[in-house]
Amino acid sequence: MLINMEEMLKVADKNQFAVGAFNATESSLFRAVVEEAEAQNAPAIVQVAPGEFDFATRDFYQYVRARLSNSKVPFVLHLDHGKTIQQCMKAIQAGFTSVMLDGSELPYEENVRLTKEVTDLAHMVGVSVEGEIGTIGVMSNSDEGGVENVTYTNPEDVIDFVTKTGVDCLAIAIGTAHGIYPKGFVPKLQLELLERIKEVAPVP
């Protein structure tokens, strides 16, 4: 069953469970994620980053959509950390049910403007949108770094951002970071910040 992120997270939030998100851009990884999710009867998010998107063909995404649609388990097909409107539209045209517009490194008002533009377009075709405020560093699979550049999410920005953009869910920064943590580095997770954001956030 292929659904969008808003539908999945509403159920998860109501029933207090987490949903795993797994990057899978080739068939063996994709099959592993789907088969294990089905074996556990667990909803899951299959996601692709923009840098990985073009490694697969449109035929692959058609296969992915068909496989997820025919499953008895709910799945979301999600673009992770899209940086531009064009990247998000490309994913929507390929049949993704959810996209992320990550404008967290932009000035706040520019992040709002860009995220709202994507949200308005995506909602026309039933695709959900994730936004981000606060930053978790530069995404990297090979370099140690990014972890010293965390900008924590300000709870006071959450309601304003969601109201102005209309996003369906929100990525926040509470101390985790992209990339490989340097040896000896211990992330400082601000769980009390997470609780404060949860109290005021109108979306998951």
Please state what every model-predicted region is:
Residues 3-11, 25-51, 58-76, 81-204:
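Alpha/beta enzyme core
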Residues 9, 13-21:
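Terminal accessory/targeting
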